[in-house]
Each structure stands twice: as structure tokens, then as C-alpha cells.
Amino acid sequence: MRKTIAYFHLPGLFEAYAFYRVFLPLFFEHREYFYDWCAIGSLHGAPADCIWGGGRVGSGEWSAQEVLALTRAYGLSARLTFSNSLLRPEHLSDGRCNALCRAFARSDGPQNGVIVHSDLLLDYLKANYPQLSFISSTTKVLTNFRQLRQELERADFSAVVPDFRLNKAFDDLRALPQPLKDKTEFLCNECCSFGCRERRACYEAVSRKNLGEQAEHICTAPGASAGYRFSSAMENPGFLSVGAIRNVYLPMGFSNFKLEGRGLGSAMLLEFLLYYLTKPAYRLRVREAIYLDAMLDLF
């Protein structure tokens, strides 16, 4: 079933809250600046000091009440990124993480959710916060399509984010029944080396760091020392371009697309949204509305 709207799931719910306070009014009040086939489905992230966190170390000191008020105002779902893969039973009673889940579960408006890796945590959340939806994290590094399909078939999850190396498995993707296509949420802008064999180890190091354990991990994959560069992500074999989303994935029946980058700065986040959401003729206007004025000095 061909889809007509691409729903983007954006990074930085807590980490880039100040940015979204400016960007979201612009997006919803000036829809002529943005592609009419694009919509925002959710914002995801986690504040600092969350032991359930994973994927990236969370940041941002904004309260749950502040971020939820923002997402409610624009009819968006808010997702907690709680994808720590190394949780133990004693971690489930953590007061900070439970308080966040309570706030998200009780919030009015669209259903909020949790991005999760650990089945231990998933079972706990299902029992204690059934109002939330649950999204299977890409940190599981499911690079075998059979594994991905099994994950999509799990009734526990409203969405599954595949490993980016399955983004171009077109024959298998086309063969999915529509209900499973509707649950598939592609990671569009991954910069990690396509052939990296350390991805799982990298995520585990972040999980340990969130637990307060020493877990320094130096990635040796090609290009890792340069950090995240959007230009490099665009050259990645797993990259999903605007043209591919509109002309390949929507016609195939897929409609959910995730952007990574909650640990990056707001300047990089803006570049993502200019590329994926904004019509080229209006990109300068969006920059001017966000930060650009005649007195700005770069050096």
C-alpha cells in the first residue's frame, strides 16, 4: 500500500528542548516552508543521569513537565530513550527513571512511549506503565533480516528500528506484510561505518557509562576519529535520502523514519531538518528564523 506521508521521529526531546521551542512553532505556523508529504511523528531522548538510558548518554536539564507541555501543544508523541542493554533487576526501582515514566504515562494527548532494548525492562514497563507504547531499539544490532522480522512480529512493540545496514534489503522489505511495514522505522542518517563490527560494543560501553561504571570505548572503525559528519553520513550505503524516502520507501508502503543525533549540537540538528523537511527555496528563511541575522559573526 503506497504511503503519502513520511513521519519523522526526531532526536533531542530533552537535549534540544530549547531548539524545538523555536523550531516547532515555525514548522506548524509556516507549513509552506516545508514539504507537504512530511510530518513530525515524535521527539525522542532522555535527560541527564538516567541509568536506563542507552545508545547515547542523555543530557539536558529540562523537566518532564516542560518537554511534555511542548509535545502536547503540537500533538506529538514523546519517547524516552531507555535502551540500556545491561540492566539488572536491582536497577528497575530507580526513582528518577520511574518518575519520568509516570509523567509520560499520565500525560494527556498522543500516546507517549519508551525506546527499549532490555527485555527485563520491557516486562517491567508493561506491568507498571501499560499506557505507554514500546519501540524496539536499533541498539539491538539486528543485522539478519530473519531476526528483524521476528522482532517486528512481536506484539510487544508498536515500532521497531532496524539496524541501518538492512535499510536497502529491498527484496525482503517489499515482502513484508503491510502491518509489519507500518511498524518499521528506518534510521536514516547513521554515520557509523557500514562494515563496523564494534557497534554492539560501542552501545554496551554507553550502557555501562549510564550505570556509572568505567567504560571507555575507543572505536577503531574507519572515520570514527572524525566524529559525526552529515556529509559522511550521506555517503554511507545505508543512508536514506529525501529522494529515496519519497520515491522508493513511501511507494513500498513504509512511512516511519528516524533521525539520530540527540547527542549532537543544535546546529547539526538544524541541518538535518533543513535537508529532510524543508523545501530548498525556504531553507534560508528557516535559518534566519532560527539564528541567522546580519550581525552574526562566525569568527
Language-model segments: residues:
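Active-site pocket-lining/capping segments in soluble small-molecule metabolic enzymes
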Residues: 1-147, 151, 157-299
